[in-house]
Amino acid sequence: MEKQEKNKISVEIYGHTYKMVGLESIGHMRLVASIVDDRMREMNVHNPSLDSTKLAVLTAVNTVHDNLLLKERLEQLEEELKKLKG
């Protein structure tokens, strides 16, 4: 089995620089970092008194919540598709 080369980049999230390492494309990793940064900034608008650690946790909680809702919706759609196929 051929070992895939890991990509390494530096990204900025909410004013801090982080090193990211992964098998995904650099573009994908930059997109992930950009979405996290955007979500943290959005959370800050509604919760300006939170420090960056609490803001990061709130962002993570909201992101996992959204992910679970999407998984539930996917399961519903898969069930509907099964019924339609008979």
Curated annotation (Swiss-Prot):
The answer, when asked if Cell division is one of the entry's keywords, is yes
The membrane spanning regions, by residue number, are none
| One GO cellular component term noted in the UniProt record for this chain | cell division site
Q: Does the keyword Coiled coil apply?
A: yes
**Compartments where located:** Cytoplasm
GO BP annotations, alphabetical order:
division septum assembly; FtsZ-dependent cytokinesis; septin ring assembly
- Major localization listed first in the record, in broad terms: cytoplasm
- What protein family does this chain belong to? Belongs to the ZapA family. Type 2 subfamily.
**Sorted UniProt keywords:** Cell cycle, Cell division, Coiled coil, Cytoplasm, Septation
A Pfam family (short name) is ZapA
Coiled-coil stretches noted in the UniProt entry, renumbered to this chain: 59-86
Q: What biological function has been recorded for the protein in this entry?
A: Activator of cell division through the inhibition of FtsZ GTPase activity, therefore promoting FtsZ assembly into bundles of protofilaments necessary for the formation of the division Z ring. It is recruited early at mid-cell but it is not essential for cell division.
InterPro entries with a match to the protein in the record = Bac_CellDiv_Activator, Cell_div_ZapA-like, Cell_div_ZapA-like_sf, Cell_div_ZapA_firmicutes
Identification of the protein by name: Cell division protein ZapA
Assembly and binders: Homodimer. Interacts with FtsZ.
Q: Superkingdom, according to UniProt?
A: Bacteria
